[in-house]
Regions:
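A broad, structure-centric signal for solvent-exposed, well-ordered loop/edge residues
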Residues: 8, 77-78, 132
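Bacterial N-terminal signal peptides
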Residues: 4-13
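Helix-rich interaction surfaces within compact, conserved domain-sized segments
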Residues: 85-134
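Sterically constrained small-residue positions within well-ordered secondary structures
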Residues: 10, 27, 84-86
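N-terminal secretory signal peptides
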Residues: 18-71
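Extracytoplasmic/secreted cell-surface and envelope-processing proteins
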Residues: 45, 79-80, 103, 134
């Protein structure tokens, strides 16, 4: 899963670079759209709703207090050790924020906290340039 993490970081850097050339029309402005993909079971501890809600309140909301969206998902990935496809429930957190260099550090802190707390191999991270308004 280290390859997935490295790929996510590269995508994030490309997304931040792409945001520098994106032109938005008023009232929208250049922003970063971030998706965090959290597995909730296989390969790590099962993450029930109570544990998820606590993690959201303690780790994610304080880092992005202006707002975010949480969706339930169903994910799958190939286990590099066993080669089989594993399916698991997941949570997708969508965050839209102004371009801000420290955003990557906040995202990495969230991913590392989740992996540590729930013994997960990885957290998917997608960062892309977007035009947004609220």
């Amino acid at each position: 899963m280290r390859v997935v993490f490295v790929l996510a970081v590269l995508i994030a850097q490309i997304g931040i670079a792409a945001a520098q050339t994106l032109e938005c029309r008023a009232p929208q402005q250049r922003m970063l759209a971030i998706d965090l993909l959290f597995g909730r079971g296989p390969g790590g501890l099962t993450v029930n709703e109570q544990a998820w809600t606590q993690f959201l309140a303690r780790e994610i909301t304080p880092r992005f207090p202006d707002g975010l969206t949480v969706l339930d998902g169903s994910g799958q990935w190939r286990n590099p050790q066993g080669g089989g496809v594993l399916r698991e429930r997941s949570k997708v957190v969508m965050i839209v924020v102004p371009e801000d260099p420290p955003v990557q550090e906040r995202i990495n802190d969230i991913a590392n906290a989740y992996k540590r707390r729930f013994k997960q191999q990885s957290v998917g991270i997608v960062i892309r340039a977007a035009c947004a308004s609220f």
